[in-house]
Structures are given as structure tokens and as C-alpha cells.
Amino acid sequence: MKKTVLREYARLIVRSGVNVQKGQEVLIYADLDQPEFVQMVVEEAYKAKAKKVTVEWNYQPLQKLHVRHQSVKTLGEVPEWQKARLQHYVDVIPCRIHLMSEDPDGLKGINMAKLAKSRQLRYPIVKPYSDQLENKDQWCIAAVPGAAWAKKVFPGMRTGTAMEKLWEAILFTSRVTDDPVKAWEEHNADLHDRCAYLNSLHIRSLHYTAENGTDLTVGMIPEGEWKGGGDTSLQGIFFNPNIPTEECFISPKRGEAEGIVYASKPLSYQGQLIENFSIRFEKGKAVEAKAEKGEELLKTMIAMDDGASYLGECALVPQHSPIAESGILFYNTLFDENAACHLALGMGFADTIKDFQNKTLDECRVLGINDSMIHEDFMIGCDSMNIDGICEDGKVVPIFRSGNWAF
């Protein structure tokens, strides 16, 4: 891939993604797959007048070794130096860039029960810090190819060819054009217009149906609002949280989901795949989960904490999106969630509450925003999916027909 094109992508992530401010610290989380591209992002951040850029590297084989050899207690510890670092982030409010490239099967064989328990131990210690940062910072999740990931997506190709093909797919779906900043401005305008229409309907609940057996009704929070594309932090800084993105989303009301939903794509969770699964809800809670592959992993995910079995997001994505029309199964939630309508189990988004900036997190949760240590998207959209909005006045409005927008 030409370095000039990659440079444009790095600039897009820094300028339109997190929108680095002069004097702001930047955190970059990355795997070891693309050090040269990470260097480009660091260079672009400094060109944007970042005060300091810190890169935190991840390597899945090391994570497997840690889980294998450390006790649950050790894995779940948060030492004082880590607490001090978290407090530093709360104090300075850095922007965060996550560059995803990990192998979808990279943690296969890991002791998931041990890993889950360690996360449960860490969560109550880390949560107060993340709560203090909620909606204050800018963040962006983007992707770069990893060799194992590329081979998973394009299994019949040589590694080099697969990497090039995955780069092409990432750049195309991320709108890295001759003028990517302008392309994103136009895309954001379209998503914001659709959200404005959805908000004008005052939808009380969404009813999903599809030929695969999906028949699910999800209740909405009266004070909730649809969002999509770029967002504005509480510091007043506009940023794009996901590159790419095609969704209009909202957080539903905890406790109001009835019926069954069938996943339309595999879910990559903690470095392992869950395939051909369904989840049945009663009174908002996931009470039954079945999967042809990864069923125990799915059940472990749903049992992570009390909120993990409730919904935190409903997102609408047409089958005519660039990612869907590419015909590529990415085995990566960032992309696959933007190829199909999806739901998320776990944490809801407080910023989907109107006037959220004048409310506390606890007040948002009282209104119905779910709280959890997880937020896991799973794809449900398909060519036969129909979605109706049941409005406050009882009127039924078609939102999706045959997998695409009905308006």
C-alpha cells in the first residue's frame, strides 16, 4: 500500500477521528502488527500539536501466557502505579486511539473462566476512573491489518496478498478518498439527518422481525435520542468515535425486551468466535442463549455481571452500506457491526439521554440506561429484516424494510 495513502489515513484518524487539540496528551493502543503505521499516527499527532503521545502495545500470545501462569488474584490486581496512571488520565483528559488488528482466533484455548473472573475483580477498582472520564474525552477506534486477521478474512491467499486486500477494504470502507475529511463531513451530515427524523417520531418501542425467526420487541427510554456519526465531548470537541461507521444508534430501556433474536454474523469475543447463535429475552433479560459454536463462551459473556444480560444499544445499519456491499466478512466487530443492524449486550450510553450533560450517571441509569462491565455488539441485520417503530401515540411507522431504510 502506498505510503501517501496510509499517511492520509493516519491524518484522518488524528484530525477527524480524535481531533487532537493543541497541548493535549494522546494515548494509542495497538498490537505489534503495524509499527510503521503507528509511527505515522504518532507523527500526525505531534503535527496537530499534541503535548505527549504514549503508545501501549498489546500482543495476544503474551496475554495467553499471563492467563495460563498467573493466579486469578494476580490477574485481577490493579497495583498502585496503575491507579496513579488512571488518575492522571482523569486529570489531563487525553484522547484515545485504538488501532485494531488482532487475530479473531488469537485467544483460542485460553481459560475464559479465569480471564472472566480476573476482569470481574478489576472492574470495580477501575470503574470509578472510567466513570469520571465518561463523555469528557475524545476517542476513536480504527483498524490496520494483522497477518493472522488478513488470512482469516482471505484464507485462500498468500499472506502478503491478503494483507494488501485487507488494507484496501479498510481504506475503502473508512472513506479514505482524495479528500477524506470532506467525505466524512458529508457522511456525518447524512447520518445526523436520519437521526433527526428518528427523533421526531418519538418511538416508544422497536419491533424486529426476520425470516430466520427473529421476533423481538425492545422498549425505548422516553428521554432517549438517536445518535450517529460524529459526537461532541463535554469539553465541546467534535470527534468521530468509530472509523468506519454507518449506524444510527440509541440505548434502549433496561428491562424492556421481549422475544428472540438470531445473529446474522459470527461474533468475535475475547479472541474467540461465537457462531450461529440466538438469544431469548424476557422482561429485558437474556434468559436463554444457544450457539452452534462457542455456546459456553456466549453464556460466560452474558453472566459477566448483572447488566451483561440486558441490552445497552440498538443500532440501525442498512444492507446497502459500503461494508455490507463489499461482501466481506471481517470477523471484527468494528466492521461487521457496520454491515448490519445490531444490538449490544451490556453497558448503555449515557449521552443518548437528552440533556445528559446536566445529569449525573446515576440519574441516567435511573431513566433506564444499562450499566455493565461489558459492551458487546452482535449483528442481527439481514436481507429479510423488517423493523417497525411503535410511537408514543400508538402509530406504527416502518423504519426498515427488507434490510434497508424505509425512509
Model-predicted segments: where are they?
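Active-site lining segments that contact anionic ligands and/or coordinate catalytic metals
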Residues: 256-258, 274-276, 283, 309-313, ...
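Active-site bordering "gate/hinge" segments
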Residues: 1-258, 389, 395, 405-407
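Dual-mode signal for accessory low-complexity, basic/Gly-rich regions
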Residues: 286-357
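Short solvent-exposed loop/turn micro-motifs enriched in small/polar/acidic residues
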Residues: 11, 199-201, 270-272, 307, ...
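Long, well-ordered mid-to-C-terminal structural blocks that present hydrophobic/aromatic surfaces
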Residues: 250-306
